[in-house]
UniProtKB/Swiss-Prot annotation:
Protein name listed in UniProt: Putative elongation factor 1 gamma homolog
One of the GO biological process terms: translational elongation
InterPro entries per record: EF-GSTs, Glutathione-S-Trfase_C-like, Glutathione-S-Trfase_C_sf, Glutathione_S-Trfase_N, GST_C, Thioredoxin-like_sf
Organism: Saccharomyces cerevisiae (strain ATCC 204508 / S288c) (Baker's yeast)
Residues in GST C-terminal domain copies: 94-225
GO CC terms in record: cytoplasm; nucleus
Length: 225
């Protein structure tokens, strides 16, 4: 019996928060079905009225789960690979490491990604360009990036120096939106630690099927005015 169904944007694959859970299902060889909401529209709309994803439905549709970080955590615990669980979430009982992982997950999945989107949306015409708001968002992105750059000058990954954790995966997924749009060659030359870290993390086995054809932007996209 399947352990459940992960609803994700299989057809367009544009949503940042769906990257990590898809990669976890594939890399951990989980008995979880990947489905696009359009393939089970009645179930999806009934169980998830906000119509956001990723979302998860357990066996026999008896329970549901929303919010990317919660889904990532649950999927990891479905794995029989105890070493992978320890690597991604930190050792059991090591609350300092686990809290640090959660700290970076939360920062990247909320404040950072929200500000990156505030820059990205005017670049593709999803949101009207407002010079004041755009400038403020860029400054907020720069402030948060400086925290990553500072940490990554000291170690290879955000929490554990010798391996990636879930914090790195969620953070790299969020950074990918910047790297395809406005983290251009000039920006990357000014942020060498973040750039090296990102290139290392997207090669992680836990991102199976996600970044094989990824290309960074050469020049910064300009807002549509």
């Amino acid at each position: 019996m399947s352990d459940g169904t992960l609803f994700t944007d299989l057809k367009e694959r544009k949503l940042i928060r769906t990257i990590v859970p898809r990669g976890l299902v594939r890399s951990l060889k989980l008995d979880v079905k990947l489905a696009d909401p359009s393939d089970a529209q009645q179930l999806y709309e009934r169980e998830f009225p906000l119509r956001k994803y990723p979302t998860f439905v357990g066996p026999h549709d008896e329970w549901t789960l929303t919010e990317a970080m919660a889904i990532d955590y649950y999927l990891i615990h479905l794995s029989s690979d105890k070493e992978a669980v320890r690597q991604l979430l930190g050792p059991e009982g090591d609350f300092k490491t686990r809290a640090d992982i959660l700290r970076w997950e939360s920062l990247s999945n909320s404040d950072f990604l929200n500000e990156v989107c505030e820059v990205f949306f005017p670049l593709i015409g999803v949101k009207p360009y407002n010079a004041t708001e755009f400038k403020a968002a860029r400054e907020n992105v720069d402030t948060i990036v400086s925290l990553y750059e500072k940490r990554l000058k000291k170690q290879q990954y955000l929490v554990c120096d010798d391996h990636e954790t879930l914090a790195d995966l969620i953070s790299a997924a969020a950074f990918s939106l910047g790297f395809i749009s406005f983290f251009d060659e000039t920006w990357r030359s000014k942020h060498p630690e973040v750039t090296r870290w990102f290139n290392r993390v997207i090669k992680s086995r836990f991102f199976e099927g996600e970044f094989e054809s990824f290309k960074m932007c050469e020049t910064e996209m300009q807002p549509i005015k």
